[in-house]
UniProtKB/Swiss-Prot annotation:
Its EC number is 2.8.1.-. Part of a sulfur-relay system required for 2-thiolation of 5-methylaminomethyl-2-thiouridine (mnm(5)s(2)U) at tRNA wobble positions. Accepts sulfur from TusA and transfers it in turn to TusE. It is found in: Cytoplasm. This is Sulfurtransferase TusD. InterPro entries: DsrEFH-like (IPR027396), Sulphur_relay_DsrE/F-like (IPR003787), Sulphur_relay_TusD/DsrE (IPR017463).
Amino acid sequence: MNYTVLVIGPPYSTQNSTSAFLFSRAVILNHHKLLSIFFYCDGALNANKFISPNFNECNLVEEWTWLHNKYLVKLCVCVSAALRRGVIDVVSNTKQNKNIKVGNLKSSFFLTGLGEFSNYLKISDRVIQF
């Protein structure tokens, strides 16, 4: 079965992101296909590489990166939602601030539009929102 996961919750103020990560890992471990994880609205904050949880908390940004690296899961972030929340990549930042070549988008995530999400909707058997 093909799954797409939609994450709309921020990394730490709700349970959405943690539940989405655990569900995504379970999908893979149960031999289903996880086509992509799409971060939208406050979910875009999951891609901020500068998030620094307490030492006794799970680092969700690193967990998402682990999932991407180990299973090649696509971590798609809505570009509009990300920019609205201050999550930017180097390319977007360079366009706006010519002299600053820094971004806070974690390298395992990539910015994309809702068109990409709609393409995954067409080929997924299930879309799960967190």
